[in-house]
């Protein structure tokens, strides 16, 4: 598959700042890929997300999305391709009801009403929120609010969804609820997903991970490759998945463990299989 995003030698400095927020950042994202971008607070993750759809303009370097180079002439076309779900959904809500809120972006784009109603219904159905169409967004749970925010993006039919710390304010159940929705949408619609996060378990969902540190790319690799550097992640203010900690502890006790990353469920299956052979 071809690349849907290409970033080359991207630099960005905030006005009045003494230090660059992003320094010589380069990477590609394949169509249909799930890419996680992790790093400590202030590492440049959200700045990078905002440079990808023109909320911020690169100081130098280039950003290409769906074959278009980001510029004043292309920014609105690129924003039609990229939807961002932010950390706090309350800051995105503008409609009196869930359905009104999902329709808001379509109204701004002049989508005819019959088509708008169809898209709103489809989007709410895809995220499992049809029964809440007439509810006030403020009365929903955190996970439900993020599902509505995702529906508002999906209704606009983007090619790329960026999750900018979208699960950081949710409890574990709400986090899994939202990630499950994104997983299904990615598979059903062929979406490309960029997950900006410091949550290691969320990053584990990705095909590849970019590790940012002080605005620079520290490493790019698969979850297995990134999580194998446990002490390095801890030094950078990040965590290591529980399953990786357990694998390391078992390996130190002389138990043969696979090198590939395993989530909790796969690790339990492996340990049961190992136990049955003893």
Swiss-Prot record:
Keyword Translocase assigned: yes
Annotated active site: 165 (proton acceptor)
Subcellular location: Cell membrane
Record-linked Gene3D superfamilies: P-loop containing nucleotide triphosphate hydrolases
A GO molecular function held by the record: ATP hydrolysis activity
Domain of life of the source: Bacteria
Entry-linked SMART domains: AAA
Binding-site positions, ATP: 39-46
Topological relation to the membrane, as annotated: Peripheral membrane protein
GO annotations of cellular component type: ATP-binding cassette (ABC) transporter complex
Residue stretches making up the ABC transporter domain: 5-239
Enzyme Commission no: 7.-.-.-
Cysteines engaged in disulfide bonds, as pairs: none
Quaternary structure note: Forms a stable energy-coupling factor (ECF) transporter complex probably composed of 2 membrane-embedded substrate-binding proteins (S component), 2 ATP-binding proteins (A component) and 2 transmembrane proteins (T component). This complex interacts with a number of substrate-specific components, including FolT and ThiT for 5-formyltetrahydrofolate and thiamine respectively.
Family designation: Belongs to the ABC transporter superfamily. Energy-coupling factor EcfA family.
Function: ATP-binding (A) component of a common energy-coupling factor (ECF) ABC-transporter complex. Unlike classic ABC transporters this ECF transporter provides the energy necessary to transport a number of different substrates including 5-formyltetrahydrofolate and thiamine. Expression of the complex plus FolT or ThiT in Lactococcus lactis subsp. cremoris (strain NZ9000) allows 5-formyltetrahydrofolate or thiamine uptake respectively; 5-formyltetrahydrofolate or thiamine are not taken up in the absence of FolT/ThiT or the EcfA1A2T complex. Deenergized L.lactis subsp.
Protein name as it appears in the record: Energy-coupling factor transporter ATP-binding protein EcfA1
Gene: ecfA1
């Amino acid at each position: 598959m071809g690349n849907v995003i290409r970033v080359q030698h991207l630099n960005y400095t905030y006005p009045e700042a003494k230090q660059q927020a992003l320094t010589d950042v380069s990477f590609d994202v394949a169509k249909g890929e799930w890419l996680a971008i992790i790093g400590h607070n202030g590492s440049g993750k959200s700045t990078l997300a905002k440079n990808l759809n023109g909320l911020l303009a690169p100081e130098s370097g280039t950003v290409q999305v769906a074959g278009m180079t980001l510029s004043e002439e292309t920014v609105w076309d690129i924003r039609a391709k990229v939807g961002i779900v932010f950390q706090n959904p309350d800051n995105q809500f503008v409609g009196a009801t869930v359905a009104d809120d999902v329709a808001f972006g379509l109204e701004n784009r002049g989508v005819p009403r019959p088509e708008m109603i169809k898209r709103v219904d489809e989007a709410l159905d895809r995220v499992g929120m049809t029964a809440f169409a007439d509810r006030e967004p403020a009365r929903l749970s955190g996970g439900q609010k993020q599902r509505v925010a995702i529906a508002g993006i999906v209704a606009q039919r983007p090619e790329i969804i960026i999750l900018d710390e979208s699960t950081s304010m949710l409890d574990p159940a709400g986090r899994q609820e939202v990630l499950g929705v994104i997983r299904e949408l990615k598979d059903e619609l062929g979406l490309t997903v960029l997950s900006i996060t410091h949550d290691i378990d969320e990053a584990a969902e990705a095909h590849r991970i970019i590790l940012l540190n002080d605005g620079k790319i520290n490493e790019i690799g698969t979850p297995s490759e990134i999580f194998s550097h446990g002490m390095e992640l801890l030094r950078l203010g990040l965590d290591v998945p529980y399953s990786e900690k357990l694998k390391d502890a078992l390996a130190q006790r002389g138990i043969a463990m696979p090198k590939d990353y395993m989530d909790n469920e796969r690790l339990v299956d492996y340990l049961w299989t190992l136990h049955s052979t003893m």
